[in-house]
Amino acid sequence: MAGKRDYYEILGVDRGASDAEIKKAYRKLAKQYHPDMNPGDKAAEAKFKEINEAYEVLSDPQKRARYDQFGHSAFDPNGFGGGGFGGGFTGGFGDFDFGGFGDIFEAFFGSGFGTRTSSARRGPQKGADLKYSMEVSFEEAAFGTEKEVTVSRLEICPTCSGSGTKPGHQPVTCRQCNGTGQVQYKQRTPFGQIVNVRTCDVCHGEGKIITNPCETCGGKGRVRKHTKLKVRIPAGIDNGETISLRGEGEHGIKGGPSGDLFITIKVKPHPIFKRHGNDVNCEIPITFTQAALGAEIEVPTLDGKEKIVIPEGTQTGTVFKLKGKGIPFLRSSGRGDQYVKVNIEVPRKLNEKQKEVLRQFAELVGDEVHEQRKGFFNKMKDALGM
């Protein structure tokens, strides 16, 4: 053990290095000295094994703690640091699978105790979902329309068809894990030798390494594109509601399904109409004479102009209902109603002739107005006990 190099020195990190720093250093060195990158180079192969041995210890918190305390002797099967009892207990239970006792031993030796996992090679992966927002007019939301949206998403590389490899070449089997996507390492404990399995850090669980990456996608298998899609806006959709387009998200990896596209609708405010559920409200002005004498007027609706009758003596704030002139029900038949509120406008400027006519009118109704006013003050006196 005395001839072995310090593990921290091998990876080129300080003893106080974080897990992330150790992992970063390992990946850099592993790629540099990997046998696939240095075919026939025995020195590089030996260096690669040395790097993996160092990382196997320093990447495991428990092993690292034992190494920091005992050095290389921590893993000497004939020494106390290796987990034996110091009296030659080297074989123990061999590669025994502790089965139901795993939870007990895990408390002492960590979650990796006796682990035998299935292949960690990553298979097909679903593409990511995408979220967009789309602005539509009040009328478009009411009656529906078809609009176009440009989506930025990752799509299958047209050059390599998603393999990530340059055409005419194939990925090579990872020598670190022999194509399994996993590496095994043995650990000696007071109960014997156990086998742990982890994802291969060289191929990241793929089992293969791309030595000739596709020039279009850089070996990733997907490229970013801006794609135009047609979106059908259903009649009756409301502000804030979402339309989902299945399979229109980012393309999957290794033949995995594509993600979905979710479009949130933003309805522009209308200068006249306000929506309440499936009903439409609006306010229109009428003149004093129209309210007093009655009239037939035109009012705006979503379908165009509609005539309504204003009865004689209509008061300001009166609401008229136009049945079936509201918003269509979403994915259903029928429509809401429209409610028209009238506001009586008082003229701000009058010429002398108009003023004279109003004075005459005031004289004609003067007694009535006086009686109404008198009645009002009498009620006030009664209420106040005057």
UniProtKB/Swiss-Prot annotation:
Describe the location of the J domain by residue ranges. Answer: 6-71
User: Which Pfam families does the record match to this protein?
Assistant: DnaJ, DnaJ_C, DnaJ_CXXCXGXG
Q: How is the cofactor bound?
A: Binds 2 Zn(2+) ions per monomer.
Q: Name one GO biological process term.
A: response to heat
- What cofactor is needed? Zn(2+)
Which residues are noted in the entry as Zn(2+) 2-binding? 174, 177, 200, 203
Q: Where are the zinc fingers (CR-type)?
A: 144-226
Q: What is known of its domains?
A: The J domain is necessary and sufficient to stimulate DnaK ATPase activity. Zinc center 1 plays an important role in the autonomous, DnaK-independent chaperone activity of DnaJ. Zinc center 2 is essential for interaction with DnaK and for DnaJ activity.
Q: What is this protein called?
A: Chaperone protein DnaJ
Q: Which organism is it from?
A: Acetivibrio thermocellus (strain ATCC 27405 / DSM 1237 / JCM 9322 / NBRC 103400 / NCIMB 10682 / NRRL B-4536 / VPI 7372) (Clostridium thermocellum)
Q: Which gene encodes it?
A: dnaJ
